C-alpha cells in the first residue's frame, strides 16, 4: 500500500513566502551576531575561542574607552543581516597588521609610562572580534527555524 501526497510546489512556496517576513529573519541574524561580537570584548576571545594577546598596559583589551565596541551596530534590511562599525581602526585590530607612518618619518604615541615614543612601525596583533563560528551559526539556524515554523503555524 502506498500513500501519496501531491503538493503544488508553487502554491506551498507562495504561502510560506507570503507569511514569512524576511526582515524578522535578518533581525534575528543581526541580533545574534551583535550579541556574540560584543561578548568577545568581555571574554577577550576570538571566534575560535583563542585568547587575545595581552596588551602592554594590562587591563581590558580594546576596551579602554569602549568606543570600538559601542560603535558596532546591527544591519538588517530583509536581505542582509549582520553587524558593522564605522571606526577606521577596527580592521587593524580585527585582522592584525603593521602600521607605518604615512606623512612623517616616525609614528608618535604615548608609551606605557605615559611618555611619547617615536617608532618606525607598530605591529598590532590580531584580536579578532568579527567572525562566525559553528556555535553561532547553529544558534542562528535554530532561531530562524523556530521563527519560520511559528509563521507557518500561524498561517
Locations of regions flagged by a protein language model:
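Short, Lys/Arg-rich flexible segments
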Residues: 1-155
Amino acid at each position: 500500500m502506498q500513500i501519496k501526497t501531491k503538493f503544488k510546489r508553487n502554491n506551498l512556496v507562495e504561502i510560506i513566502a507570503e507569511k514569512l517576513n524576511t526582515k524578522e529573519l535578518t533581525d534575528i541574524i543581526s541580533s545574534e551576531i551583535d550579541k556574540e561580537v560584543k561578548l568577545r570584548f568581555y571574554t577577550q576571545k576570538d571566534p575560535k575561542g583563542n585568547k587575545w594577546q595581552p596588551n602592554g598596559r594590562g587591563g581590558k583589551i580594546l576596551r579602554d574607552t569602549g568606543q570600538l565596541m559601542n560603535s558596532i551596530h546591527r544591519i538588517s534590511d530583509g536581505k542582509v543581516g549582520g553587524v558593522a562599525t564605522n571606526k577606521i581602526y577596527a580592521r587593524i585590530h580585527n585582522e592584525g597588521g603593521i602600521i607605518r607612518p604615512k606623512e612623517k618619518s616616525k609614528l608618535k604615541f604615548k608609551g606605557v609610562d605615559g611618555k611619547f615614543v617615536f617608532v618606525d612601525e607598530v605591529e598590532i596583533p590580531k584580536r579578532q572580534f568579527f567572525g562566525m563560528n559553528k556555535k553561532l551559526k547553529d544558534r542562528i539556524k535554530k532561531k530562524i527555524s523556530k521563527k519560520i515554523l511559528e509563521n507557518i503555524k500561524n498561517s
